[in-house]
Every structure is written in C-alpha cells, then in structure tokens.
A protein has these predicted regions:
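Intrinsically disordered, low-complexity, mixed-charge
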Residues: 1-99
Length: 99
C-alpha cells in the first residue's frame, strides 16, 4: 500500500425492505451469515406485513455485495422487490443480530 493512495471511504449504512416470499425460508439466518462473512454489523427482522427489514453497516463495497445477495436471497426464497436506502451518518451497531 502506498501513502499516496486516497483514503478508503468510511463506513456507511444500508437500510433494506425486502418483499416477496422472504419469511419462513431462512432469509434472516442466511442474511446474518452473509453479513458476518462480509464483516458487516446491523440487524435483520421480519415485519408483520410479510417483508424483511435489514439494516447493515460497514464498508460500501461489502454493503454492495450484501445488496446484490438480497436481490435473490437464499434458494428457498423469492425476492420481488428490494427498497434500498443509503445513509452516510449513523449510530454504530455492534455485531449482526436477528431480531
């Protein structure tokens, strides 16, 4: 690594609402595994309307990988739509949890 390289962008936050067949198909457990693999923090939970809500924090490239995964999810799921919100500033979250 050279000292003249620009600094890497800081942590960002990604907030997703995923709709389709995403509950009862291990979506949250697989999202947690993917987040751990990508060294992201945050949480994932089922919503009463049948969607899954996911909040992740970390490096942008890793968040983009999680977003790409969220568009198809685990094999048993069917993702119809992913509502995506990027946030620059956030309060840090420890670990990645299923709520």
């Amino acid at each position: 690594m050279t000292t003249s390289a620009p600094p890497s962008p800081g942590p960002r936050q990604l907030h997703l609402f995923i709709s389709g067949l995403v509950q009862g198909v291990s979506f949250r457990a697989n999202a947690q595994r993917m987040a751990h693999t990508l060294q992201l923090t945050g949480w994932v939970r089922n919503l009463p309307d049948g969607r899954v809500e996911l909040l992740a924090q970390g490096e942008e490239k890793n968040l983009k990988s999680l977003l790409a995964w969220a568009h198809h999810g685990p094999a048993q799921s069917r993702v119809d739509h992913v509502e995506t919100h990027w946030v620059e500033h956030h309060a840090p979250v420890e670990g990645f949890h299923i709520q």
